Amino acid sequence: MKCPFCGFADTRVIDSRLGKEGNNIRRRRECSQCERRFTTFERVEDMLPLIIKKDARRQPFDRKKVIGGIQRACEKRPVSIATIEKIVDTLERQLQESGEREIESKIIGQAVMDALHDLDQVAYVRFASVYRQFKDINEFMAELKDILAEGGNVRDN
């Protein structure tokens, strides 16, 4: 591997360890020329399907985009970033295990809504209002009534 400091091509591994999550390998390397040390990480390349957008465009799955959407829905809610990352980890695992080469964006949106529905119903309604693009207040109210019928806790402030 090329040294990031001097560009020399010959480096040696001086230590290898399994990463915290067990899905990568952390390697300490030393350059044979400048003798500086640096860290590299090795992990299996994700084989995620392309996402088919509503307008039929295809684009790679973007973990950051999904996390961002969930974070916006969970803003000022008692949902940790670790919980959000677990939702996206689960989604990525499901996508990998599906073996599909392409998947419609609505399937991803529905999976996120399902996870939020079980986690925080206010975040669920926020996400659904953007994702489903309610056409009017009646559609929005129908969704709220469904949540209330399921025993959801929506408080008046």
UniProtKB/Swiss-Prot annotation:
Example GO BP: negative regulation of DNA-templated transcription
Keyword entries, A-Z: ATP-binding, DNA-binding, Metal-binding, Nucleotide-binding, Repressor, Transcription, Transcription regulation, Zinc, Zinc-finger
Domain of life: Bacteria
ZnF bounds (unnamed): 3-34
Pfam families hit by this protein: ATP-cone, Zn_ribbon_NrdR
InterPro entries xrefs: ATP-cone_dom (IPR005144), NrdR-like_N (IPR055173), RNR_NrdR-like (IPR003796)
Domain spans labelled ATP-cone: 49-139
Cofactor binding, note field: Binds 1 zinc ion.
Cofactor (UniProt): Zn(2+)
The keyword Transmembrane helix is annotated on this UniProt entry: no
Protein name as it appears in the record: Transcriptional repressor NrdR
